[in-house]
């Protein structure tokens, strides 16, 4: 199951993949990710939110759950 989630993360477009990876796999907080990426905190929150939505779509296709 962990591999499936990782594969789904890797399938994301890079603009969503990087913040998702930093947040969930490297345990960075939103302000830290904003500094790393040179973006505003609100932008990072939006990227994380949109990335999560895209992950749901990918995983729903994989597992066919709602």
What are the language-model segments listed below?
Residues 19-23:
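A short pre-motif secondary-structure segment
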Residues 65-66:
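Intrinsically disordered, low-complexity basic tails/linkers immediately adjacent to helix-turn-helix/homeobox/MYB/SANT
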Residues 4-13:
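Short amphipathic alpha-helical boundary/capping segments
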Residues 31-32, 42:
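Residues within helix-turn-helix
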């Amino acid at each position: 199951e962990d591999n499936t989630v990782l594969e789904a993360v890797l399938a994301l477009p890079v603009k969503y993949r990087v913040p998702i990876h930093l947040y969930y796999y490297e345990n960075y907080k939103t302000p830290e990710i904003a500094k790393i990426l040179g973006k505003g905190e609100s932008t990072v929150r939006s990227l994380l939110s949109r990335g999560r939505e895209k992950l749901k779509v990918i995983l729903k296709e994989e597992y066919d759950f709602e």
